[in-house]
Amino acid sequence: MKTNVIIDGDACPVVNSVIELTKGTGIFVTILRSFSHFSQQIQPEHVKIVYVDDGPDAVDYKIVELASNNDIVITQDYGLASLLIDKVHTVMHHKGNIYHSNNIQSLLNQRYLNAQIRRRGGRHKGPPPFTTEDRLKFEHAFRKIINQI
């Protein structure tokens, strides 16, 4: 069974890393984006871009539809990750963290608490900027996963 890397691609900073690391491996890459992120950039043969309608969660629904048990999904969306943990081989964050059934609930709880703070007009600290160190951590974790497949 072939392996696909499915990327929640509208704001993913590791797309180019994934494309490079999968070259010549037999692993295919599917990048999902909304039409508002349309690009005519030519991709390598092992890369396919799927565009979906703009709208809340449209990309997420398409990822759930396309994903299968041998796939690797890259997303920063905890809700999407929770739907995929038991469906695919691996779900990972673009900073290299792997989502598991033992860590997803605390991430969802934190997301809920942050949403409550925002609804009350409050503010909370957002994520720090993506760094070179984050990219290297992701690439190391991603290499480990694709070497296991």
UniProtKB/Swiss-Prot annotation:
UniProt-listed InterPro entries: UPF0178 (IPR003791)
Question: Where does the source fall among the domains of life?
Answer: Bacteria
UniProt record similarity statement: Belongs to the UPF0178 family.
Q: What is this protein called?
A: UPF0178 protein SERP0336
State the organism of origin.
Staphylococcus epidermidis (strain ATCC 35984 / DSM 28319 / BCRC 17069 / CCUG 31568 / BM 3577 / RP62A)
